[in-house]
Amino acid sequence: MMKKIIFTLLFAVIGINGAFAQFEKGKYYLGATTNSAGLSYSKDSKFRLNLGVNGGYMFEDAWLAITEVGFDYRNSDMQQFYAGAKCRYLIEQNGLFLQAGAKYIHGAKSFNDVQLTPEVGYCFFFNRHLTVEPSLYYDLSLSDFSDRSEFGLKVGLAWYFNNN
């Protein structure tokens, strides 16, 4: 019995050390996100389809610079395209991440907005490269704070890799 416990602890330590390697300087990041499950709230809470694509680079250990582009369909009158940049800090000990950024939104009826985008989430690593990243976000609208700001839950799928 003691042998099983020791081997289990040994494999857990090896697995934890391997998980930290994902946060090394020089890694690249590709991801896709959605918050289409209706798990967000704003004054304009109707049907919604949101898809985003992200790419990034780990410029220091645990620090990731990310660019994003995406599409947000809210109803037949409001489709939005967005582009933004974010900086993410990955907490190596537990997989949590803190992220902040900004995005520019262009909507159908000549609607333009800039939003600040703080976010907190978790990286569930399936292996050394593939993650599922649920996160809580708040999109703070600078043009219409009361009607366009929203908070919610989004889920991402990401791939961390080296360029060699």
Q: Residue ranges of each PLM-predicted region?
A:
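Positively charged n-region of N-terminal signal peptides that target proteins for export
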Residues: 1-5, 22
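Sec/Tat signal peptide C-region and signal peptidase I cleavage site
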Residues: 16-21
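Transmembrane beta-strand segments of Gram-negative outer membrane beta-barrel proteins
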Residues: 22-38
